[in-house]
Amino acid sequence: MRLNDDLSARTVVHAGAMSWVPSPAKGVERRMLFRIGEEKARATSIVRYAPGSRFARHEHPGGEEFLVLEGTFQDETGDFPTGTYVRNPPWTGHAPGSASGCTIFVKLGQFGEADRTRIAQPPEGGTAMPRQPGVTSSRTLFDGANERVVIEEWRSDIELDNPDGLELLVLDGCFVEGGDMLERWSWLRLPAGEPLYAQVGSKGARVWIK
């Protein structure tokens, strides 16, 4: 399977309006945003676990990162409530599930081979950054050699340079970018060199950005 795999093209997916697609694990469904491959794939998805559902133990050769959007995600290493951000390096494994149900935003197979640091940022964790025009809050969750991950709250129009490529997920609120209204769980990817111009609504927006 190849889905939204042209990294040179601007891509928008309104994931909040998509249907859920069953996964091989009973009670686990997903909304696919980007994918190259079948079950062992390089992928970006929103995944929903029904109460009591889980995957069998497996490894992620290319690493895994996820943000808990709703509920509490669980594996052998602990419980991860809403707002937790986790990076599991290449070749780490687990048996993920949720006793009470949860929804996560997850990226698979997109680590560099040298990225071997496991991170588990709690809700509201990370490093607070200085405020910028239009940005009322900015927290860096990860800052590595090739990428930086932040959560920001926007209260007015935003302009961001984008020399290296950018993707974001709207966590709350809304804004208009490139003529598209991006609302909760909308996903945007911009190629390197294409700046972001966001017209932010009166309620503001909270976004996850890489």
Give names to the regions the model predicted.
Residues 1-39, 101, 105-150:
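A short, N-terminal "cap"/entry segment at the start of jelly-roll beta-barrel domains
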Residues 53, 57, 131-162, 166-168:
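Catalytic core of non-heme Fe(II) oxygenases with the double-stranded beta-helix
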Residues 53-56, 74, 86-95, 188, ...:
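Histidine-centered metal-chelating micro-motifs
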Residues 45-46, 56-60, 77-78, 96-97, ...:
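Short histidine-centered beta-strand/loop micro-motifs
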Residues 28-32, 36-74:
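The feature marks the first
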Residues 50-51, 60-75, 156-158, 162-178, ...:
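Glycine- and acidic-residue-biased ligand/ion/polar-headgroup-sensing regions
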Residues 28, 79, 90-115, 181, ...:
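Ligand-binding loop in jelly-roll beta-barrel domains
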